[in-house]
Design a protein with these regions (language model features):
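Rossmann-like NAD(P)(H) cofactor-binding subdomain of soluble oxidoreductases
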Residues: 38, 46-49, 55-129
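Conserved beta-strand termini and adjacent loop/short-helix elements that scaffold enzyme active sites
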Residues: 32, 52-54, 114, 149-152
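Internal alpha-helical scaffold of NAD(P)-dependent oxidoreductase catalytic cores
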Residues: 100-110, 125-159, 163-180
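Short coil/turn segments
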Residues: 8, 116-119, 164
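A general structural signal for well-ordered alpha-helical segments in protein cores
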Residues: 12, 39, 62, 74, ...
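NAD(P)+-binding Rossmann beta1-loop-alpha1 motif at the extreme N-terminus of oxidoreductases
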Residues: 1-53, 57
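A generic secondary-structure signal
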Residues: 18-21, 80, 178
């Protein structure tokens, strides 16, 4: 399994860390260079991690694609990429619904929305998935507790509340450093 991440922010870092610490079998993980600091840090920390020259190289070389960019960036780049029907595409994009992702991807691939939270790096916490998907569930069950959502409207509640997790943990980290 070749895993490709388009976007390398805090959530990608947490997901990749969780994958590398799990029993998920993969041949390589290819990261976009979007955040050079994070992509280089992940490559240095774990084996089988590579940094792509561009996003299309990730799509060309991987059978699992993780879309981990902001909604604004997603609208600028996803429709330009040439995906394959055989790929599993997992979107972490908060406000882009499944219908819009399908339009942007332009092929009938296996597409899911997933809401990873920072504790995924420790293989803990809930991982909401929409729509229910056996292959995606079997992948993410190694990284936390999978919650299958049958109604996309309900996932908006998860997106809204989970958006506060990263700032909350950042605040705790800052406070902890200050106390030391």
């Amino acid at each position: 399994m070749k895993l490709g991440f388009i976007g390398t922010g805090k959530i990608t870092s947490a997901v990749v860390t969780g994958i590398c610490k799990s029993k998920i079998k993969y041949t390589k993980i290819i990261l976009s260079e979007r955040n050079k600091k994070i992509s280089k840090q992940l490559k240095k920390s774990f084996k089988k991690i590579y940094i792509a020259k561009n996003n299309q190289d990730i799509v060309n070389d991987c059978n699992w694609i993780f879309l981990a960019v902001t909604p604004t960036v997603a609208n600028q780049i996803i429709h330009k990429l040439k995906f394959k029907k055989s790929q599993v595409i997992v979107s972490f994009i908060s406000t882009m619904n499944l219908q819009n992702i399908k339009k942007a991807v332009k092929v009938k691939a296996n597409i899911s929305r997933v809401i990873p939270l920072p504790p995924i790096s420790f293989k803990k916490g809930p991982i909401p998935i929409f729509p229910p998907n056996r292959k995606v569930k079997n992948f993410f069950k190694h990284l936390g507790t999978v919650v299958e959502i049958k109604n996309e409207k309900l996932s908006k509640n998860f997106w809204s509340t989970s958006g506060m997790m990263a700032p909350f943990y950042e605040l705790l980290r800052t406070m902890s450093e200050w106390l030391n």
